[in-house]
Amino acid sequence: MPEISVQGLSKAFGGVRALHDVTFTVRDKEFLTLLGPSGCGKTTTLMSVAGFQRPDAGTITCGDRTFFDARDKVFLEAQDRNLGMVFQSYAVWPHLTVFGNVAFPLKIRRMKKEALRRRVTETLELVEMAGYAERYPHELSGGQQQRVALARALVYSPAVLLLDEPFSNLDAKLRERARTWLKRLQGELGLTTLFVTHDQDEALSLSDRIVVMNQGEVLQAGTPEDIYRRPATRFTAEFLGHCNILTARAVTATAQGAAELVLHPGGQPLTVSGEDLTAGAEVQLAVRPEAVELSALSEAAGPNAYKAELRGVSFLGDHYLYELDIDGIPLTVTDTRSFPGPSVTVRIPPSACRVLPP
């Protein structure tokens, strides 16, 4: 499977910037996700790769083929790109059976009847829909329609698979099963895949790498773990999962891989590791709720430990969500244990603090 290279992509609609210098590569057999809120430019990027949108600047290549080059005025039409596309709405044709929907791309390619039947049957078996070939879309569930749309995108062996929020119309349980099934299928087939979603759980569970977008720009690209544990911006930290953003001031410069900060003047020092800081610098810290350690107030505190007042608690099945207050500073923490309060000891490990760039 070829790789997709997007370089310097820009696009404006009526003077409103939709994309600005968007650059990334989808590697061979990789599952890459464009993640961001509504209006961030992720779908415009996907539609540009698919050939449904013509950018204003930049290049798009697939292997040794140029799909788009603004400078050389190259624009390959969507039907000539050999890409598989699954839309958010599935777009299965209601007047055709499951077999007819999946067979349509082969019919317009004028595949011989026997080869067509064999290929459609193989593809329906691949997506576990072989027993539904003669049913119509209105006789299928949302998850089944989704598989029909995927089969239709795969049946002609596309170079790359594109998916535009394909799970958004499914309920939570079905989405979870669909994610597991799609990831397994993508791995088995070795499909180079470009996926678009605003759902952080989908991005984390499916992706080999994630490209975080906002306001038409790429903010960060990396593995799910890298982006979650080492966010490059406040937006990324807050958008990908839950995160505490704490304002602190460095009281010592970084020495031997560690520096001391305070959350408020005269406060207890907070040691952070792996960050290059100068004394007096004001910084923002990203701290994940699950990285903070809770204990009963009577237990020994130690370094980076604070007394916190319990302001609220929510039971969420496999864990509790605690809303705490440290000398007027709010902090959200998750823990599997129950703490009755009214006060607890909070310890913030040095490695749990990520200093965000200014």
Segments predicted by a language model, with ranges:
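ABC ATPase nucleotide-binding domains
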Residues: R81-G84, Q88, V92-F235
